[in-house]
């Protein structure tokens, strides 16, 4: 089943001028987090040249996090469908580039990506 995810700038290298920035991503619910990472890289035109992680927490700055990365595993063991619905008050975040700290919040969306009409 294909689900739509909304990717929003959450913290770090995003400035206040980009508060309403977002991207929608359509992806199979059985796709693993590595596949989601590659979709995000494509959606934001990054070059996949830095380390990254996903984590579930109340906020970006929460000390209590459930992490998914190369060291803690989880990138290939969990599908997107395994993570949603998230526990109450929890959010899914994606951190790319520990130096520049690009933080994104990922939520399920009911909005679908509009297809461009051929013309």
Predicted regions and their residues:
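Short linear regulatory motifs enriched in tryptophan with gly/pro/ser
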Residues: 1-119
